């Protein structure tokens, strides 16, 4: 039943996309003169209206002598004007891709709508191309990345949207390394990506530490990186927990400081027990390898994006023609964490988005 409904929905969407009645609205009059000049402004306007690639827009305008409406109709017929219709749909699945060049390592998050497309070969190839392009440029601007090389990546994205039929977006770029430091990366199941930057040591060591970060999700790199405001907030929280214990003030103060140190040890990377061996801290691991922590960046697919939760029970009841549906299950929520940990996560803006970069 669900498959049939999906097919009907796809058919309806496709019909509206290619309907001859549907028209795009343009800011300038269309031209009917022969051999009209195809200007950059005209190409830009057609591209913004249809979502098609730059070269496709130019070819269509050239074919129809600058008649922008005729060119738009042609792009629609060819299925190249679909990308903009997908842009408002939620894209919370995807892939984290990694690439290195010139002494730096980058992570790129590319989003799509379903995990099925996230596993598609064409989608994976596009994500890898985006990472390679990001590694070849300066900075971490998504806008600059998409506009590089004559909008090559943006055109590839629009073409992939047209081919696959889902909203696909390059969401963010993270970069580390300057050539004078050592960087490494670890990507877990294409969904969690970590960059680690150290002074001294090897790329393999960076990768091992990155694997630890992926698993343990520390909030900070070192205790020195924890903002003073966050420490005071946690101290106030811990004090409120024990101030009614009836114990003397000096004992309460010692309890608070002890719990605060435990909080810092649990939430700072170098203070955590190294997950692969459980016999030393990350700080000790770095020391044994003659390395010093500079920082890390951790990103995960879809974090910070609100996903649509389908009410399957209500859908079935509606299709059955009535009857009150049973309450739908709640949206999936993260597992409960200790109050101190939850408070720590709320205290850092970067951590709220799970794009953790320290320092």
Curated annotation (Swiss-Prot):
SUPFAM superfamilies listed in its UniProt record: Elongation factor Ts (EF-Ts), dimerisation domain, UBA-like
Pfam families named among the record's database cross-references: EF_TS (PF00889)
Keyword line: Elongation factor, Mitochondrion, Protein biosynthesis
Listed GO MF terms: translation elongation factor activity
Compartment(s) of residence: Mitochondrion
BP terms from Gene Ontology: translational elongation
Region (Disordered): 323-345
GO CC term, one of those recorded: mitochondrion
Main subcellular location: mitochondrion
Ranges of compositional bias, category Low complexity: 323-341
Family note: Belongs to the EF-Ts family.
Additional notes on this entry: This protein may be expected to contain an N-terminal transit peptide but none has been predicted.
Annotated protein name in UniProt: Elongation factor Ts 1, mitochondrial
């Amino acid at each position: 039943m669900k498959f049939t409904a999906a097919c009907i929905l796809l058919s309806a969407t496709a019909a509206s996309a290619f309907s001859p009645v549907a028209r795009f609205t343009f800011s300038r009059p269309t031209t009917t003169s022969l051999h009209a000049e195809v200007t950059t402004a005209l190409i830009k306007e057609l591209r913004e209206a249809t979502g098609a690639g730059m070269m496709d827009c130019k070819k269509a305008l050239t074919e129809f002598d600058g008649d922008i409406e005729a060119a738009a109709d042609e792009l629609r017929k060819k299925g190249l004007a679909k990308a903009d219709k997908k842009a408002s749909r939620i894209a919370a699945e995807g892939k984290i891709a990694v690439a290195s060049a010139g002494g730096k390592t980058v992570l790129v998050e590319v989003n799509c709508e379903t995990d099925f497309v996230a596993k598609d070969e064409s989608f994976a190839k596009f994500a890898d191309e985006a990472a390679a392009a990001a590694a070849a440029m300066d900075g971490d601007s998504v806008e600059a990345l998409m506009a590089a090389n004559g909008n090559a990546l943006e055109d590839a994205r629009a073409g992939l949207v047209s081919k696959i039929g889902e909203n696909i977006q390059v969401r963010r770029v993270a970069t580390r390394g300057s050539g004078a430091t050592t960087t490494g990366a670890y990507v877990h199941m294409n969904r969690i990506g970590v960059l680690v930057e150290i002074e001294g040591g090897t790329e393999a060591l960076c990768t091992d530490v990155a694997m630890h970060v992926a698993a343990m999700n520390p909030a900070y790199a070192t205790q020195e990186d924890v903002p003073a405001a966050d420490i005071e907030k946690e101290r106030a929280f811990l004090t409120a927990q024990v101030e009614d214990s009836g114990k003397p003030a000096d004992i309460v103060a010692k309890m608070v400081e002890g719990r605060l140190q435990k909080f810092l040890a649990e939430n700072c990377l170098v203070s955590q027990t190294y997950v692969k061996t459980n016999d030393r801290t990350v700080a000790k691991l770095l020391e044994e390898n003659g390395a010093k922590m500079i920082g890390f960046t951790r990103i995960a697919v879809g974090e910070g994006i609100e996903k649509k939760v389908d009410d399957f029970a209500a859908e079935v009841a509606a299709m059955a023609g009535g009857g009150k549906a049973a309450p739908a299950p709640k949206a999936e929520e993260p597992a409960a964490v200790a109050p101190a940990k939850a408070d720590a996560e709320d205290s850092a803006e970067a951590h709220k988005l799970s794009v953790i970069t320290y320092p």
